[in-house]
A protein has these predicted regions:
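The conserved cystathionine-beta-synthase
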Residues: 7-28, 34, 53, 73-92, ...
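Short beta->alpha transition motifs characteristic of CBS
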Residues: 32, 39-54, 92, 96, ...
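N-terminal/domain-start segments enriched in small and hydrophobic, helix-friendly residues
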Residues: 1-7, 45-50
Length: 116
């Protein structure tokens, strides 16, 4: 499964995000929310959706209203083992790798690597 399956446009709805998360099957249940220029502007998890629904948002609410804007990432040129360890130490396991224009170029899933 490629990282593109984790990308979704901010103009889509909570219902669209639920369908996308359901289609991920056994993958990490995190979506990267992109603007119309394919730049990441937030993340969305099943927990974010649950909180949005509990707070009164409907299935037709757009993702830009409920996404998590303070997401963590690594810049492509700063991709190092030390940075990965820092994320693991903070229990962040699914990390988007961004280019200089905030496009997702790859994703690291630390669940797939053994701890040392």
């Amino acid at each position: 499964m490629t990282f593109e399956s984790h990308c979704i446009n901010s103009s889509l709805t909570i219902k669209d995000a639920l369908i996308a998360l359901n289609n991920l099957r056994n993958a990490t249940l995190t979506l990267f929310v992109l603007n119309d220029n394919a730049q990441i502007i937030g993340t969305l998890t099943d927990g974010d959706i649950r909180r949005a629904l509990v707070n009164g948002h409907g299935l037709d609410c757009t993702l830009d209203k409920v996404m998590h804007r303070d997401y963590k990432f690594i810049r492509q040129k700063e991709f190092t083992v030390a940075n990965l360890r820092s994320f693991r130490d903070r229990r962040i396991i699914f990390i988007p790798i961004l280019d200089g224009e905030n496009h997702v170029v790859d994703v690291v899933n630390l669940q797939k690597f053994k701890s040392k």
